[in-house]
Amino acid sequence: MTGRQREREQRPQPQTGDQGHPRRWLILVALCAALLVIVIDNTVLNVAIPEIGRTFDASTGELQAVLDSYVVVCGGLLVAAGALSDRCGRRRVMVAGLVVFGLTSAGAALAPSVWWLIGMRAAMGVGAALVMPATLAIMVRVFPPHERPKAFAAWTAVGSVALGLGPLLGGALVDLWSWAGIFLVNLPFVAVALAGVVRLVPESRDPAAGAPDLPSTVLVTTGMVALVWAVIAVPERGALATPVLAATALAVVSLAWFGVRQRRASAPMVDFGLYRDRRFAGASSAIALIAVATGSTLFVLSQYLQLVRGHSAVVAGMAALPLAAGSVVGSALGARAPARIGYRACIVTGFAVTAAGFGVLAALGPDSGQPHIAFGLLLCGFGTGFAGPAATSTALGAVPADRAGMGSALNDTHQQLGIAFGVAVLGGLLSTAYRAFLPTGVPHDASTSLAATLSFADERTSAALADAARLAFTQAQSATMTAGLACALAGAAVAMLSLRSGRRAPSR
């Protein structure tokens, strides 16, 4: 650390009070740049999934692991990372996370096998875990309560732009270069985000924060990794297979031990008392459920567009634009709507619209056109965008200021675990249903994914089998989207039953 940096950190920061930090909107720009790095990486990967599957001859389970290794590790470390940022400084931890993310992105681009890629994705999850809690904690600190919905809406809108930009960029890189380009493109984004964070974001910390609990971090991460792996492995190995049962047992023991440690700790990583607040518990549950619903959407549709409809990666990437556009518009309206119709009404309405979008996507057939897909994704994006600012404000507004790092980390954890289980559970449903709808007589190795079946059919010049495989995937996709619809409606029901109506900005 240079003398100038040390002097800047030691200099008293302006108090936020009711007016907020005087540079809060510039700070938000820097935080959104960091968010952009993380979201683009996740969305860019979905478009490359079919190409990665062909390159490494990967099964559906291995492709799920490529996505989930990042999400599960990130989710498992978020709470510890939040505690670390509270103790060591939120800006410092964010900078470290961006550096780790950039280095491991380069390592992923050089992957010689699918398991190397899975390992690098897990390491990227470490970097993302260091970045995410700090962003929301800093936003809560520099923005007064009445401006937070606007700030969260801008934050959500940037994520939505990345949601549209990522697949389009990824498709171009895959078509013009290779899947490795989707990881190398992270490097310039990381450099820009680092410059903005170092230059604009003030340092902040909680003087009373304790050291991160390493044993508890290991327990919760191990438990979640084991549980998600067990769910992913069920379609290929069976629910009663020894490895699946062993992973499930490891998950139960690890997570139970984690819970016991937290209840006995004088300064726990997770304050379970937060969940006694209906606002925090209700909003967090709703956020997790909508993440389950939406987590596998692009994973599934990318394969549908490229392997069933025969589109290029660029065209598949363009299909995500309505999702992003809907989310941007929804976020803009959702930032102002709580003051007019209330926070609960915003969440319930948004999730209901998202459920309608899944209903449209569940009706897709092998020959459905782009307008059908675009309309479904537009509804999904608008609904989640409209509900997002109210849900985030409600959850974080229930957290005391001195627990901002923990609260934002838990908020991110609920989202990441929702996405992880969405990919694992709904991806598992896709895989199981696909096998069930395939004609009898297809060898096991050829039924592990649509790409594997199409390759098998091509070797035997069987156009009939290829057509049957595409139909089977479309039917399995409909089952998956119907499950997403159910999750979105469940999120709306949780918000309706657990949250109170009202238009006041949530605050503790």
From Swiss-Prot:
It is a multi-pass membrane protein. One of its GO terms (molecular function) is transmembrane transporter activity. Residues 1-20 are annotated as: Disordered. One of its GO terms (cellular component) is plasma membrane. It comes from the Bacteria. Keywords: Cell membrane, Membrane, Transmembrane, Transmembrane helix, Transport. The chain crosses the membrane at residues 25-45, 65-85, 98-118, 123-143, 154-174, 178-198, 214-234, 240-260, 280-300, 313-333, 345-365, 373-393, 417-437, 479-499. Gene3D superfamilies: MFS general substrate transporter like domains, Multidrug resistance protein D. It is found in: Cell membrane. Its main location: membrane. InterPro entries: MFS, MFS_dom, MFS_trans_sf. Residues 1-11 have a biased composition (Basic and acidic residues). PANTHER family: EXPORT PROTEIN (PTHR42718:SF42), MAJOR FACILITATOR SUPERFAMILY MULTIDRUG TRANSPORTER MFSC (PTHR42718). This is Uncharacterized MFS-type transporter SACE_5813.
